[in-house]
């Protein structure tokens, strides 16, 4: 499948990226793709015209255009679960009808969005108060796709907050909910329980704890709880009125669900109008993905760059480095989006893959990461392709000098990764500091940077609701393109099941009501340790 590209890699792996710029003064322009004022610059990679042509050929060989059309048309492309993949319908604000199994779904999508809008507006205005007055705080309880997306987006769009404060609880560790609820008023807090099945053990454990906390503190759970779930029988049994339950269809996967009711906390924080702008930004990326030629298509070129670095060059990970503190949760969000989607070892037809599908995705916001792991990125033996992102302008005009420093650092890091520092330059630096003789050579070698390390840069005017929508949709479609080329199902997640099953069986063992004798030696010994130490007074 990749033979021609491997041959190109063999022929070009020794050249310097800097030389590509010297040979082509228009390289930055020719190896970028734009959507309006958003630009993806992938020129600081080894990709040239021949490599790009070879990568684009993968799209045609994998019938990407047909599979893209099938996804948007509601075909059951999630073959292992027999489901359509239509998170794009949730942001189809002014598009045409969308059908699943012959039924038009946009009427329900618009109805749900209108219900969310009315609920959010009433909550924000004080028309839906808690037992102690207008709601001041919202606690979203969920995990995975029910937490990572809204938590990331609420933080990212902090400059647009004009509603109640939003908090997020995901971990079943009691410390998480205890720390979150501490200081909140139980009579003026809304709790949103986000679980499609309303059975997720972490979420339901936290939900019951929050309900008890609210009842003890004078709140009214019937007025102050809402749910995002399709299990209306379970939400009713929990005590949540039907008019406060917001559902979504099984053709919306959890990690793709931010655009609908899972985004209720975001709508409450920023308001329905800005939430609409968020959806419109994503819809703009959808239309771009559907219409732009491959070489100018942002999701396609971001995906092909990823394929080149992981499948062809053999780099096992990639770092997502947003130079925006408010995007601090984006790397974790993309970890789920990419690693849960494409962390597969079996092709769509059930045969084993002959190499890893998705890479390890990790990262931190700049400039913090520069003082943590950039040492390895610059001078480690392994190459880590980096994906920088930065806005030309921040939201704090009186702190514009901060933002200029932020941009300078972002651009400097991508340049330094490419440029490096040769030994003769390192020797000159050491000599200028008064180092001489054998010590000069030793010191110089510590100051050598290999350079020639690839990176992309996503740059845009400002992080607005619409721009955040574009960014998230860009990465969603990137995952889809990579999955199509690799021949895998990007929309199931069987890898999360086994651990959940074993955790359920271990519950009684950890409680001490069942024996650990049937477990392996290590697990049994760890259980024995827990039972022996958990009641020990450590004060």
Curated annotation (Swiss-Prot):
Cited InterPro entries: G6P_Isomerase (IPR001672), G6P_Isomerase_C (IPR023096), Phosphoglucose_isomerase_CS (IPR018189), SIS_dom_sf (IPR046348), SIS_PGI_1 (IPR035476), SIS_PGI_2 (IPR035482)
Task: Indicate the residues that form the catalytic site.
Answer: 340 (proton donor), 371, 500
Please give a single GO biological process term from the UniProt record.
gluconeogenesis
Pathway as given in its UniProt record: Carbohydrate biosynthesis; gluconeogenesis; Carbohydrate degradation; glycolysis; D-glyceraldehyde 3-phosphate and glycerone phosphate from D-glucose: step 2/4
In terms of PANTHER family, this protein maps to: GLUCOSE-6-PHOSPHATE ISOMERASE
Sorted alphabetically, which NCBIfam families does this protein's record hold? PRK00179.1 (NF001211)
Q: What's the protein called, per UniProt?
A: Glucose-6-phosphate isomerase
Q: Which organism is it from?
A: Ruegeria pomeroyi (strain ATCC 700808 / DSM 15171 / DSS-3) (Silicibacter pomeroyi)
């Amino acid at each position: 499948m990749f033979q021609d590209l491997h041959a190109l890699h063999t022929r070009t792996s020794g050249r310097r990226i800097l030389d590509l710029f010297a040979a082509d003064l228009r390289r930055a322009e020719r190896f970028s793709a734009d959507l309006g004022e958003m630009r993806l610059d992938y020129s600081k990679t080894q990709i040239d015209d021949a490599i790009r042509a070879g990568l684009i050929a993968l799209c045609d060989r994998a019938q990407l255009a047909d599979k893209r059309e099938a996804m948007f048309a509601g075909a059951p492309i999630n073959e292992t679960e027999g489901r359509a993949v239509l998170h794009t319908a949730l942001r189809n604000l002014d598009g045409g009808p969308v059908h699943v199994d012959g039924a038009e779904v946009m009427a329900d999508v618009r109805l749900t969005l209108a219900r969310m809008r009315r609920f959010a507006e009433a909550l924000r205005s004080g028309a839906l108060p808690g037992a102690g007055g207008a709601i001041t705080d919202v606690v979203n309880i969920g995990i995975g796709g029910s937490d990572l997306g809204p938590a990331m987006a609420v933080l990212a769009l902090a400059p647009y907050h004009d509603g109640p404060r939003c908090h997020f609880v995901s971990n079943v560790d009691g410390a998480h909910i205890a720390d979150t609820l501490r200081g909140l008023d139980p009579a003026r807090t809304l709790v949103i329980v986000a679980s499609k099945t309303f059975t997720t053990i972490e979420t339901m454990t936290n939900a019951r704890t929050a309900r008890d906390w609210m009842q003890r503190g004078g709140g009214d759970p019937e007025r102050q709880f809402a749910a995002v779930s399709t299990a209306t029988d379970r939400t009713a049994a929990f005590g949540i009125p039907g008019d406060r339950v917001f559902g979504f269809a099984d053709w919306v996967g959890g990690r793709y669900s931010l655009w609908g009711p899972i985004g209720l906390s975001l709508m409450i924080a920023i308001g329905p109008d800005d939430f609409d702008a968020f959806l419109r930004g994503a819809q703009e990326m959808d239309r771009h993905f559907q219409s732009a030629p491959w070489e100018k298509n942002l999701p396609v070129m971001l995906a092909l760059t990823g394929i080149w670095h992981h499948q062809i060059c053999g780099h096992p990970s990639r770092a997502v480095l947003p130079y925006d503190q408010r995007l601090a949760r984006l790397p974790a969000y993309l970890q789920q989006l990419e690693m849960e989607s494409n962390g597969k070892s079996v092709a769509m037809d059930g045969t084993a893959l002959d190499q890893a599908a998705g890479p390890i995705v990790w990262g931190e916001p700049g400039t913090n990461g520069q003082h943590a792991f950039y040492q390895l990125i610059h001078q480690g033996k392994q190459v880590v392709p980096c994906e920088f992102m930065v806005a030309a302008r921040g939201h704090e005009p009186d702190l514009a000098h901060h933002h200029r420093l932020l941009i300078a650092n972002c651009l400097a890091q991508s340049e330094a990764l490419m440029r490096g520092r040769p030994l003769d330059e390192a020797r000159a630096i050491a000599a200028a500091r008064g180092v001489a003789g054998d010590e000069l050579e030793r010191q110089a070698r510590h100051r050598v940077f290999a350079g020639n390390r690839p990176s992309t840069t996503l740059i845009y005017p400002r992080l607005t609701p619409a721009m955040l929508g574009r960014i998230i949709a860009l990465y969603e479609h990137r995952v889809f393109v990579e999955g199509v080329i690799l021949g895998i199902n990007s929309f199931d997640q069987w890898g999360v099941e086994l651990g959940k099953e074993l955790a359920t069986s271990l519950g009684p063992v950890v409680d001490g009501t069942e024996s650990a004798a049937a477990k392996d030696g290590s697990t049994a010994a760890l259980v024995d340790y827990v039972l022996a130490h958990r009641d020990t007074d450590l004060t």
